[in-house]
Amino acid sequence: MSAPARLAEAAVSGAMSLPVGALRAGRGTRRIAFARQLAMYLTHVGFGLTLTEVGACFERDRTTVRHACALVEDRRDQPAFDFAVSALETGLAHLAFGLQLRFGREGSR
């Protein structure tokens, strides 16, 4: 798993009070599945990895990543959820800066 994906996974697991291992499991509850989808979204949108690259990081197909991103985007219409995702994005951007990773649309691989 790439460094950006690990950062996103750790941030989401911490924010949702879930063990990182739960996000790596093959299946799980809806809450765990959504946490994994959010981590995939942050890896794709925040770090700019392609859907295929994100899929490889999370051992999922690129179409699964596309579906995850669509679900998160749809929920961002809810102000509280959008605020939480924005806070995660900001936190990841600060961490990425400190670790010399690129965070943003242009991303780094």
Regions of interest found by a model, annotated:
Residues 52-58:
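Short alpha-helical "recognition helix" segments of helix-turn-helix
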